[in-house]
Amino acid sequence: MGTVILHSVVSVDGFIADDKGDVGPLHEWYFSGDVPILPGSGSGSGGAEGDEPFDHSGSGGGIRVSRASADYVRSTWDSIGAIVMGRNLFDQVNGWEGKPPAGEHVVVVSHRPKPDGWHPEASYHFVDDVTEAIDTARALAGDGTVAVNAGDVGGQIFAAGLVDEVAMDVVPVVFGSGRRYFGGVDGQHLLEDPHVVIQGERVLHLRFRVRR
């Protein structure tokens, strides 16, 4: 089965959003470069063939990263078979309207079911347990990567020992408070030295294997 990777864009002081859930300048690097990245253009594409991709930029400009980040972002997204997310993020982005940025499948950790009539064609699966979420995502992803969105749910999955790697796109900004990358994790966990270190423009891409 594929690798389970905890991932998010993060401030240098460890926050993925402010107290209200706003990402502020964290995602600016996604939309300020010269190289277009089409969500769902890899080995697993969200939505049916011929569908218009969901506009993750929110402005119609699409995702455009620097050349330094482009190869890393493409290879990362191309490897993803399934995404695991919490209900808060699902509600915030309305599940990307059934068209995730990468992979073909999404598992949502929630005590509430999928909304009635919501994009019945989309491969979105609602479960109420983090272990079940990873088991479901791995089965759906096959040999592909399982990408877990960081935050409260991601922190629970990490604390349960279900994460193989930690991936951070570190942006040079200090939030001071907000929603933490690792959620409520309060114990010590050792990681290996980073095996990926890529300096982009206004972002540093890092990946660490979890020490077992």
Language-model regions, residue ranges each:
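Short acidic amphipathic segments
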Residues: L162-D164
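Portal/gating segments that form or line small-molecule/metal binding sites
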Residues: M1-A160, P172-R212
